Amino acid sequence: MQIVCNEGNVIKPYLVYQKDAVAEYWIPGAFSNETASRVLEGTKKVVNDSNGTGYAAHRDDILLAGKTGTAEIKASKDDTSGTELGWFAIFTAEDTVERPILIISMVEDVKGRGGSGYVVKKDSLVLEEWFSSH
């Protein structure tokens, strides 16, 4: 998701937290600015459109963006007894946010519990704590 937030540029990852680190592009121009902007707008709709799959994490006070996903784990194409895992990536979508956040979560065995929607609901609790505690 960071490629979308950085106008199509892949930031060089750091293994050690550096409070005053300056972002260094690892793969400049991996996406065009136009493509990154389109994807970002789509991820905003996931959380902010009432029909979006991540709408349960919507907040009126902070603009968030995200992507949901569900993977079926099964032995064959015709297998109906497999399980599912759900995942959700959500991040603050404004540069002016005082306490930005990026959460990427995955939960196994969400079949019958709402798929990725189950993960969205769990992350909404984390977001509430994050934004209300400061």
For each predicted feature, which ranges?
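Active-site beta-strand/loop architecture of penicillin-binding DD-peptidases
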Residues: 1-25, 50-134
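C-terminal beta-signal and terminal closure region of outer-membrane beta-barrel proteins
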Residues: 24-50, 131
